[in-house]
């Protein structure tokens, strides 16, 4: 009889790369980065489709006769906007004659404003003021600020008021022989007498706590008054000095102008200019006192519930060729912390006409159709990778990637994986540091590792039989390192908050620190991933070694009395008793079934954070249990000896 020895032998050649891990090493035919770099998409997007609302005009108005050619958004996104062609929030606030007057109201955690162009220099609104850009800037800034602190907002288009009997609603020649709806102009018709100027005006208005279904915790009110260049211009009838002042219920001055105590401009001119300051006022009863002849009475407000902080996106709103625009929206964005601006790079070129349906704007606003994982001034991201090539400009919200270089992202083994023995990778002398990770976060943190060091992560689980680390202990190592990473990050945030408290007066210092912190977080995360990679490699190596023994056991069972196992993974067979077909049945499963495999490697890692990026406690979660790579028959050679 001819006896032969058949063994399982792992095939490794120069095409394999070696990967070291905690508890075991691997040879692999391929490797891949744990994450790829992502690139943000320019424009606007939202974190949650169910929690945002838009405020717009004809470019988001589905009722426009030229829709969808007139729109800069999709039909789906247009449904989320409160819009009317020709409208704007400021037009509805002041109500100039002949302009669209739309009741803007709605609720959402994230508010997108794409309006404003309908009140611009092209509109040529006069009413005692030819250039309203500075008032528009102040108005938009206050709208964005209050919207970022509220869930709901609404125009209040009719305030309760008490008007003095001696005044009547007036008009003005330089306001199309009409006047604004807010403020309303009231005048006194005075017959020649000793009191030729009439009497001082005293009126009252009430800011409600609720308007329809909308709760009002704070109102935006326009406090308007005339500015005279000199006392003589106003005092043509011997009316003394001009004043128009608003008082709260306690008698405190909250807005207006009083030339009895404040100087006139000193300029030369015969026509006054109207100025409107934006006041943030609580609900309640207010009084207005003015000098005789004129009374400018607040008639409208925007009310805000101030229930939750939210996100605000302002979209640049400009005309196409031939019409003059302003940049109040852009400037208001710069003045509003946490506000994101979507800005064109090219002139507006419309499809429906010169001013409606711009392709660039459609691309910039296309992200509103989707949910993003991260939105920022640099753009939006919906990929799951935690890294991007460039630093994302703040503000940013959601699960935003950190800046990193591609070569710094750890690589993991892929393709055909073959374990080493494992006996040469046991940690016998624990270290007191993990990759110096305590130095990664600009000296803010110190990581105290238990006396067992790395061995503590593997719970000191050396196999009694001599080599390797158990799969169970490696999995426990994942749990332990995950907990320590959470502690590390919690300590980071506490230190960051303390530093922020110390330098809140210095905005540039905050910006510099923010960048430093983000860079440190990126470095720390890369360090954490390096640890996880090493645990992954060790865990897979251990599992693959176990799978080899399982395969050997299966072969022994199939062979029965036809083969004798003389050492782990080696059998003696009588060639005369068990021919080639017999051997194929035993060792190749008669090629009718593959060698039992284990599920493929899944290294998906999900970085979780609060909806608001800064100050959040980042958490690291392995979303699925780490599984083992498949062993295929082509990865095993059968070595025969006589």
UniProtKB/Swiss-Prot annotation:
UniProt catalytic activity: N-acetyl-9-O-acetylneuraminate + H2O = N-acetylneuraminate + acetate + H(+); N-acetyl-4-O-acetylneuraminate + H2O = N-acetylneuraminate + acetate + H(+)
Record topology, Extracellular segments: 1-617
Membrane topology (Cytoplasmic): 639-642
The protein, known as: Hemagglutinin-esterase-fusion glycoprotein
Stored Pfam families: Hema_esterase, Hema_HEFG, Hema_stalk
Subunit structure: Homotrimer of disulfide-linked HEF1-HEF2.
Gene Ontology BP, a term: endocytosis involved in viral entry into host cell
Free-text function comment from the UniProt entry: Binds to the N-acetyl-9-O-acetylneuraminic acid residues on the cell surface, bringing about the attachment of the virus particle to the cell. Plays a major role in the determination of host range restriction and virulence. Class I viral fusion protein. Responsible for penetration of the virus into the cell cytoplasm by mediating the fusion of the membrane of the endocytosed virus particle with the endosomal membrane. Low pH in endosomes induce an irreversible conformational change in HEF2, releasing the fusion hydrophobic peptide. Several trimers are required to form a competent fusion pore.
Gene source species: Influenza C virus (strain C/Taylor/1233/1947)
Family, similarity comment: Belongs to the influenza viruses hemagglutinin family.
UniProt KW keywords: Disulfide bond, Fusion of virus membrane with host endosomal membrane, Fusion of virus membrane with host membrane, Glycoprotein, Hemagglutinin, Host cell membrane, Host membrane, Host-virus interaction, Hydrolase, Membrane, Transmembrane, Transmembrane helix, Viral attachment to host cell, Viral envelope protein, Viral penetration into host cytoplasm, Virion, Virus endocytosis by host, Virus entry into host cell
Start and end residues of each stretch annotated as Esterase domain-2: 297-351
GO molecular function, one term: sialate 9-O-acetylesterase activity
Localization per Swiss-Prot or TrEMBL: Virion membrane; Host cell membrane
């Amino acid at each position: 009889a001819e006896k032969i020895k058949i063994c399982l032998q792992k095939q490794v050649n120069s095409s394999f790369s070696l990967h070291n891990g905690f508890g075991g090493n691997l040879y692999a035919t391929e490797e891949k980065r744990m994450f790829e770099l992502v690139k943000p998409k320019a424009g606007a997007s939202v974190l949650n489709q169910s929690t945002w609302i838009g405020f717009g005009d004809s470019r988001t108005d589905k009722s426009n006769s030229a829709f969808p050619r007139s729109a800069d958004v999709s039909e789906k996104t247009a449904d989320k906007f409160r819009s009317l062609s020709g409208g704007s929030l400021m037009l509805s606030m002041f109500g100039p004659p002949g302009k669209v007057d739309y009741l803007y109201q709605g609720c959402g955690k994230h508010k997108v404003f794409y309006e404003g162009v309908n009140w611009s220099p092209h509109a040529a609104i006069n009413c005692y003021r030819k250039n309203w850009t500075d008032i528009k800037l102040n108005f938009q800034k206050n709208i964005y600020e209050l919207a970022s602190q509220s869930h709901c907002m609404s125009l209040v288009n009719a305030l309760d008021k008490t008007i003095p009997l001696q005044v009547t609603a007036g008009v003005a020649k330089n306001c199309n022989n009409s006047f604004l709806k807010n403020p309303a102009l009231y005048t006194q018709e005075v017959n020649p007498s000793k009191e030729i100027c009439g009497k001082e005006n005293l009126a009252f208005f009430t800011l409600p706590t609720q308007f329809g279904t909308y709760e009002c915790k704070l109102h935006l009110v326009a406090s308007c008054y005339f500015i005279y260049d000199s006392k003589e211009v106003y005092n043509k009838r011997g009316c003394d000095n001009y004043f128009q002042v608003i008082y709260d219920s306690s008698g405190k001055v909250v807005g207006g102008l009083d030339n009895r105590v404040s100087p006139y401009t000193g300029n030369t001119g015969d026509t006054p200019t109207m100025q409107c300051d934006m006041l943030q006022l609580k609900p309640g009863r207010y009084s207005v006192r003015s000098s005789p002849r004129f009374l400018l009475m607040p008639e409208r407000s925007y009310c805000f519930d101030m229930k939750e902080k939210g996100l605000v996106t302002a979209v640049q709103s400009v005309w196409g060729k031939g019409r003059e625009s302003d940049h109040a929206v852009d400037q208001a964005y710069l003045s509003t912390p946490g506000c994101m601006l979507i800005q064109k790079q090219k002139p507006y070129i419309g499809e429906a006409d010169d001013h409606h349906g711009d392709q660039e704007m459609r691309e910039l606003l296309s992200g509103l159709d989707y949910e993003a994982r991260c939105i920022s001034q640099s753009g939006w991201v919906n990929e799951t990778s935690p890294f991007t090539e460039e630093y994302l400009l703040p503000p940013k919200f959601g699960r935003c990637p950190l800046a990193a270089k591609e070569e710094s992202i750890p690589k993991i083994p892929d393709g055909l994986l073959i374990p080493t023995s494992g006996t040469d990778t046991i940690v016998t002398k624990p270290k007191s540091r993990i990759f110096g990770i305590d130095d990664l976060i600009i000296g803010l943190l110190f990581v105290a590792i238990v006396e067992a060091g790395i061995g503590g992560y593997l719970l000191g689980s050396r196999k009694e039989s001599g080599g390797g680390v158990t799969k169970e202990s490696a999995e426990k190592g994942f749990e332990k390192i995950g907990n320590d990473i959470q502690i590390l990050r919690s300590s980071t945030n506490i230190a960051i908050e303390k530093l922020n408290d110390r330098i809140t007066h210095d905005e540039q210092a905050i910006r510099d620190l923010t960048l430093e912190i983000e860079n440190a977080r990126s470095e720390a995360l890369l360090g954490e991933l390096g640890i996880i990679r090493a645990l992954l490699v060790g865990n897979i190596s251990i599992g693959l070694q176990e799978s080899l023994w399982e395969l050997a056991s299966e072969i022994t069972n199939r062979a029965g009395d036809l083969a004798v196992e003389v050492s782990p993974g080696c059998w003696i067979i009588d060639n005369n008793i068990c021919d080639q077909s017999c051997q194929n049945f035993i060792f190749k499963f008669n090629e009718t079934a593959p060698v039992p495999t284990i599920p493929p490697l899944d290294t998906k890692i999900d970085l979780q954070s609060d909806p608001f990026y800064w100050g959040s406690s980042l958490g690291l979660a392995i979303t699925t249990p780490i599984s083992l790579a498949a062993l295929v028959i082509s990865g095993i050679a059968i070595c025969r000896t006589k």
